[in-house]
């Protein structure tokens, strides 16, 4: 006898002729139980009332009857909890504060610590307005009050409207001036003490919203951020505003310096800058070249150390940020030992960020060059840092005196094989006549020769560098000692 017949007889004996499956009301050939429950969800949520308006069945979460609640009996209620005394917390906070300032130490497993308790907040400055210090309650309210009405500069409503319109007009003019980068001419405000000088639009390169969005994407996606600096002027190509942003918003990300273009400066200059910058962050000297590089092994070893610190992750991402034309893409090509990023000796070659695989656990991210806006930087400083393409600059001959200040005379004589110039104009004219770059009437092509000099200056054909602070102090100290010695010798002769 089959199993199905036995089961049928058992149901008849027990009086249950159903097949055992629980069916939902409304289920049929067209709607299955899941669809019916989904449709009933729309109908639910309302209370059911009788004809008198009394609630027969309350809606969900509407019932006023409170069920009996009991605390779950558990042995853990009577065991030790994770507590810490204030002395131990303060001791740990002091130790953590000392190590957080040291950029050569890494905090592992940050999520295991109560960072909200450990981070000390500056309680000296209160965010509230200090109104009571300037004007007390007694001077405003009570029998000794000196104020009878609010302090408004206007005596009537018409004057208030007029003053508001004037302030709004002044604000709109100021914002329009900012948007055009001062192209409307020199503007001065003696009361506020600001002066807006005419500035070429080309000198705003690297400050657009699109490029800053690319930078933020690179910072958010990176575990390690490499700040690429130009070895000739590391402090000039250093983005301090980005460092402050990372220190405040992303303190868990690692930031290191890479001093690129070390082949353009003497060895003692590169060593002095590495020593100076190592006080703030880990610093490496680097020369980007696919065939003959320097510092490649040290950088790869450092990245491997960072990957070993984050063993809980499958891979880490390394982002490259910095000024335009500092060699970010060239460093990536050097690490990969082949051309994976487009490079050029002109700024602005990298337009968007891109991912490159270095090895199984390390990825590299290339970023467009950024220029933090600064009121201290002049057009000459921006041009000499390689931010702007020289062919787009108008009147390039006005920047040649700055080149003569930064470069030694012997280097210029050796590069261009000329000597005996008196000023920048004389230097341009001598070089133009030597190269045969003359216009109609035998006049020198000052604009073309000036662009050539600026390109040679930015691309490393003319040797120049900024002296490190320690070496500059030593130089001043030696000069002072020599002056003291010469003064003593004069006294002895007298």
From Swiss-Prot:
One of its GO terms (biological process) is ribosomal large subunit export from nucleus. Residues 1-20, 473-494 are annotated as: Disordered. One of its GO terms (cellular component) is preribosome, large subunit precursor. GTP binds at residues 322-329, 366-370. Residues 212-373 form the CP-type G domain. It comes from the Eukaryota. The keyword Protein biosynthesis does not apply. Keywords: GTP-binding, Nucleotide-binding, Nucleus, Ribosome biogenesis. The keyword Nucleotide-binding applies. It is found in: Nucleus, Nucleolus. InterPro entries: G_CP_dom (IPR030378), GNL2_CP_dom (IPR024929), GTP-bd (IPR006073), GTP-bd_ortho_bundle_sf (IPR023179), NOG2_N_dom (IPR012971), P-loop_NTPase (IPR027417), TRAFAC_YlqF/YawG_RiboMat (IPR050755). GO terms for molecular function: GTP binding; large ribosomal subunit rRNA binding. GTPase that associates with pre-60S ribosomal subunits in the nucleolus and is required for their nuclear export and maturation. Belongs to the TRAFAC class YlqF/YawG GTPase family. NOG2 subfamily. This is Nucleolar GTP-binding protein 2. It comes from Candida glabrata (strain ATCC 2001 / BCRC 20586 / JCM 3761 / NBRC 0622 / NRRL Y-65 / CBS 138). The lineage of its organism: Eukaryota, Fungi, Dikarya, Ascomycota, Saccharomycotina.
């Amino acid at each position: 006898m089959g199993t199905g017949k036995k089961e049928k007889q058992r149901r008849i004996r027990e009086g249950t002729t159903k097949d055992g499956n629980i069916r939902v009301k409304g289920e049929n050939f067209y709607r299955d139980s899941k669809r019916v429950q989904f449709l009933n969800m729309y109908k639910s949520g309302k209370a059911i009332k009788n004809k008198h308006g009394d609630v027969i069945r309350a809606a969900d979460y509407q019932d006023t009857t409170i069920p009996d609640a009991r605390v779950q009996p558990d042995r853990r209620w009577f065991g030790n909890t994770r507590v810490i005394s204030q002395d131990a917390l303060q001791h740990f906070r002091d130790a953590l504060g000392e190590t957080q300032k040291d950029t050569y130490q890494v905090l592992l497993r940050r999520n295991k610590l109560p960072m909200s308790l450990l981070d000390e907040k500056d309680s000296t400055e209160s965010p509230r307005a200090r109104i009571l210090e300037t004007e007390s309650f007694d001077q405003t309210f009570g029998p000794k009050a000196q104020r009878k009405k609010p302090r408004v500069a206007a005596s009537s409503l018409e004057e208030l409207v007029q003053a508001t319109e004037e302030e709004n007009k002044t604000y709109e003019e100021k914002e329009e001036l900012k948007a055009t980068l001062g192209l409307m001419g020199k503007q001065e405000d003696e009361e506020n003490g600001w002066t807006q000088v005419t500035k070429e639009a080309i000198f705003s390169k690297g400050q657009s919203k699109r490029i800053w969005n690319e930078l933020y994407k690179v910072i958010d996606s990176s575990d390690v951020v490499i700040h690429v600096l130009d070895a000739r002027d590391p402090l000039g190509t250093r983005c301090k505003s980005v460092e402050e942003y990372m220190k405040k918003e992303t303190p868990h990300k690692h930031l290191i310096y890479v001093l690129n273009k070390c082949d353009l400066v003497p060895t003692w200059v590169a060593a002095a800058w590495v020593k100076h910058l190592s006080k703030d962050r880990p610093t490496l000297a680097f020369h980007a070249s696919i065939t003959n590089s320097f510092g490649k092994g040290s950088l790869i070893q450092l990245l491997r150390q960072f990957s070993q610190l984050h063993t809980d992750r499958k891979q880490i991402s390394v982002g490259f940020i910095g000024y335009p034309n500092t060699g970010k893409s060239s460093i990536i090509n050097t690490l990969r030992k082949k051309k994976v990023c487009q490079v050029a000796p002109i700024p602005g070659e990298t337009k968007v960020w891109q991912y490159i695989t270095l090895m199984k656990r390390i990825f590299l991210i290339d970023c467009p060059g950024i220029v933090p806006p600064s009121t201290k930087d002049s057009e000459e400083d921006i041009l000499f840092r390689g931010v702007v393409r020289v062919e787009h600059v108008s009147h390039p001959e006005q920047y040649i005196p700055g080149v003569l200040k930064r470069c030694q005379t012997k280097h210029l004589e050796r590069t261009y094989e000329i000597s005996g110039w008196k000023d920048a104009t004389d230097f341009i004219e001598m070089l133009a006549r030597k190269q045969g770059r003359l216009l109609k009437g035998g006049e020198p092509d000052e604009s073309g020769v000036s662009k050539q000099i600026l390109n040679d200056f930015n691309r490393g054909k003319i040797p120049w560098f900024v002296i490190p602070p320690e070496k500059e102090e030593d130089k001043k100290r030696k000069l002072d000692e020599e002056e003291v010695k010469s003064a003593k010798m004069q006294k002895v002769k007298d």
